[in-house]
Amino acid sequence: MEMLNIKEFTKEWKAGIKAQMDGVSARLAIVQIGDNEASNRYVKHKKADCIECGIIPEIWKFPESITQEKLEGELRDIILGRPSGIIIQLPLPDHLDKERLISLIPERMDVDGFKTNSQYDPCTPLGIKIYLEACGFPFEGSNVLVIGRSDIVGKPMARMCTDLNATVTLAHSKTKRLSDHIQNADLIICAVGKAGFLNCYPIHVPVVDVGINFKDGKLVGDCINTDNRMVTPVPGGVGLLTRCALMENTIRAAEYKNK
């Protein structure tokens, strides 16, 4: 297996999405609350991705002080405008109920794939799967270790790998003798969220690093300062795949809407 350059891979992926846009009109509504610096940056990137792919971005920005009731009303109005997809930029201020807001988004518009009955796969595991398939990873019969069992990364990632006939171990904070599972793995997908979590283990297989952590003022993953060239970079790795998968889900939503 060859680990493809993710920046080059996602550039080609977005070009492919744009090529599919012929005759398809797609709009992505991005709901942002407050003026969080990180959220501003992420929304800026997603807007640029939309434009690059031929998708119309619609940015709905509300003050941090907005009430739950007011925001729910605004969200209902956005839904009535019938965009192809809707996402809510996270994190939200503490006084807002994230789960309640996401529950209001129709399944056909849930392009983040956050709802349990969404029509789309969550973007991060979808992006990872498509990337690994392009790299030629032989899922069938391989031992895949997924570390982290969140509802939007670990669990759906394990399901996708199982659907591709891999033998999957879903590890978590209570897993005993993790080193044994690491030693037996043909591929590791780590979504723990602890800087350098994997550094204490000898690893000689491909690693997809989903971790987003800050250490000494720098963005790092769950595996840092490693000589293993088979580890995806942070930054410039899974985040790019996630954003491309969002564009992929959005065009799927547009095609569904136009049927």
What is each residue range found by the language model?
Residues 1-25:
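Positively charged, low-complexity intrinsically disordered leader regions
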Residues 25-35:
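Short beta-strand segments enriched in small/hydrophobic residues
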Residues 32, 87-91, 147:
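Short beta-strand segments
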Residues 38-47, 122-210, 215-229:
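Glycine-rich phosphate/diphosphate-binding loop of Rossmann-like nucleotide-binding domains
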Residues 50-64, 168-171:
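Short beta-strand elements in bilobed, periplasmic/extracellular small-molecule ligand-binding domains
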Residues 70-81:
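Short, well-structured alpha-helical segments in soluble
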Residues 85-139, 196-198:
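Anion-binding alpha/beta catalytic cores of soluble intermediary-metabolism enzymes, centered on
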Residues 98-112, 208-257:
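Rossmann-fold NAD(P)-binding glycine/threonine-rich loop
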